[in-house]
Amino acid sequence: MIYKFGERLTEISQEEWEKEKCPAVFLTDSNHAEETLAIAGIVYEAEIQIAKIGFCKIENQQECMVGTFCIPKLLDVLGSRYRMYMFVNENNVVIVDDETFSERLINRIKRKRMHQGETKERFLYNYIAEFMSRDLEILVAYERRLLRMEEDVSQDHTDTIQNRLMPIRRELLNL
């Protein structure tokens, strides 16, 4: 999928994009990543291995910036994660995602945001803000659990505190 930058992200075909050569967001999977990177004018010499992504990072290459994201699934914080690559050059953004996570984020941006992607910087801000948007809700839920535990401790109900605290600590470390 290709989304043309503008006040509204507009999905366009590859043929339309090749005629216009306008700045855009390319969304692809790892099977089509090399081809999509070439179309977008991005040179990346390393192998794309989504399964090996273990953390979030951004690094500068000669012609682009490359980022990897490893985001815990909020319903299973200790379990599986969303993994993807993001490539950014002077004009384009390429997202390599083997699941539907990025597609859902882009659809949410299109549905909720007034200024969706006039520039690649605005798009990147919206994209990252969108997957962080539920973090506050999750942290509030943890705060409530910890406050209940604090109340239990203040009433000398300390028998199970350690057993209740360790899973919370592990989950928070993964977020």
Label the model's feature ranges.
Residues F69-L175:
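Extended amphipathic alpha-helical scaffolding segments in membrane-proximal extra-membrane regions
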Residues M1-M114, R145:
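Helix-boundary and N-terminal cytosolic regulatory elements
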